Amino acid sequence: MSATLSIVGIVAGDRVYPATRALAGSIVPFLLLGIYVLYVRTDHTRQLWAWEIRSPMSALMLASAYAAGAYYFSRAVFARRWHHIGRGLLPVLAFAALMCAVTIVHWPLFLHDNIAFTLWAALYFTTPVLVAAAWWVNRREDTGRPDEHDVAVPDRVRRISRGIGLVGLVTAGLSLLFPGPLIDAWAWPLTPLTARVLCVIFILFNVYLVALSRDARWSAARVNVESLVVALVLIVVGVVRTRETFIWSGPAAWLFLVGVVAALVVCLGSLWWAGRGRAIRESPTPDETEKVRVIGARSSGIAS
């Protein structure tokens, strides 16, 4: 049976600062524009994007990551408590910082005359600093206390998530540094630039896994898991749209498809499990009350 956590009274602190809300709101329009260009006008990246993306699935992957970000930041604007969104800023920070690095490394390949490149550069040269500042200042608001009738994520599940995330980070990190083997073996054609962007997207998802595994409160994971569902659904649709460009004769295409579908099933299953857990009980047992105290102590230590 799922462990359901409950607290009495109003949680002090755990606020989302106005500056954090403002930052989240200012990022959303950029992401929506990117989704439109990459997911709807996929064949017009030379005219409408920061660089020409010849493989449509590469464009759809980036658009899917942007969709996850747009959902997350939209929720952040209206979040009631900091811990609902706090864990998601670290993956965003990693994504933005690495995109900035990729931009510098492949600077000559970008279409500097396109307005999209100006927006791209403005976004990725400023976002890492702004997101890091928002997380650093706002993190002190996390009291470590769960929501009313919160659900505790089992330790075993969090250990598995952390292990998968760490393995994924090492693999994606090595491919980011040395993209040649990835280009040779991947499910669709890649260039060095699109290969590195793909690695950054994989790093984003795996940092999510590691960051979320550090907190037992489901309320700290829910928005982020929902964001992953948004991205994974769009990726599945993207595979269907661009299936003729996949290299189905190799294992990478099948492994990619199975991995995406499996991740989507796990995310949807976790949302169902947590919803069911919240519905089972509306008052804590003595054991659950003790678990509230333990989770609060652990999460407060991490947040500080």
For each predicted feature, which ranges?
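Surface-exposed interaction/gating patches
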Residues: 17-36, 143-217
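Short, highly charged, low-complexity non-transmembrane loops/tails of multi-pass membrane proteins
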Residues: 152, 279-303
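Hydrophobic alpha-helical membrane segments
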Residues: 91-103, 201-205, 224-240
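An N-terminus-focused feature that recognizes amino-terminal "leader" regions
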Residues: 2-88, 103, 117, 181-190, ...
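Core segments of alpha-helical transmembrane spans in multipass integral membrane proteins
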Residues: 57-74, 94, 193-213, 230
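Hydrophobic, ordered structural segments
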Residues: 68-144, 238, 248-277
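Extracellular/periplasmic helix-loop-helix junctions in multi-pass membrane proteins
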Residues: 188, 214-222, 240-256
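Juxtamembrane "helix-exit" motif on the non-cytosolic side of transmembrane helices
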Residues: 39-47, 103-112, 176-184, 239-247
